[in-house]
């Protein structure tokens, strides 16, 4: 259990760093919850370093200025922080947790509506917008993995 909490702490630091970049409203708690359900904070070896399970289509969406002109100002913020987002490849963002978190944040920023603050609301938002019907997760799983200290359901990966 301690290993899970240590890993969750690392994910929390990354999520809070993403908030400090200023790519949109602060959503660190939602990013942490996504990491819990998508990869058990990266402990699920099948996820590799793709902690937020950003797929190639979602990644392309984070670089698509035609569909999402609001990305332009976010690219400038990233460039000012030494990250030339339009030049990155999927392989790069999949293998580096910070870039993976940025991809998740940009992808979420392209979605409609505000992110709910409560766990059930976030579970529904995640399933409707992030995991979608083609993803294998459920709102029940999102809630279960994010209840209590956030270690439920991750014990199998330690």
Q: What positions do the PLM features span?
A:
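Peptidoglycan-targeting cell-wall enzymes and recognition modules
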Residues: 1-16, 22, 33-112
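Inter-helical turn/loop segments and adjacent helix faces that build the functional surface
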Residues: 111-119
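Long, amphipathic alpha-helical surface segments
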Residues: 123-158
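Secretory-pathway/luminal and periplasmic proteins that interact with or process carbohydrate-rich
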Residues: 39-46, 114, 131-140
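Alpha-helical scaffolds flanking conserved acidic
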Residues: 25-33, 118-126
């Amino acid at each position: 259990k301690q290993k899970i909490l240590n890993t969750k702490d690392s994910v929390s630091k990354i999520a809070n760093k993403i908030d400090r970049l200023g790519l949109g409203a602060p959503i660190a708690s939602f990013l942490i919850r996504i990491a819990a359900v998508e990869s058990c904070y990266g402990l699920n070896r099948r996820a590799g370093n793709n902690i937020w399970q950003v797929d190639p289509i979602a990644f392309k969406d984070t670089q698509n200025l035609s569909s999402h002109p609001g990305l332009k100002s976010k690219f400038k913020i990233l460039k000012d922080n030494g990250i030339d987002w339009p030049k990155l490849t999927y392989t790069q963002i999949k293998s580096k947790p910070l870039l993976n978190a940025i991809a998740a944040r940009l992808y979420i920023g392209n979605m409609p509506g505000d992110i709910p603050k409560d766990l059930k609301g976030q579970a529904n938002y995640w399933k409707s917008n992030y995991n979608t019907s083609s993803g294998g997760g459920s709102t029940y799983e999102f809630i279960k993995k994010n209840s209590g200290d956030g270690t439920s359901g991750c014990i199998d990966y330690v």
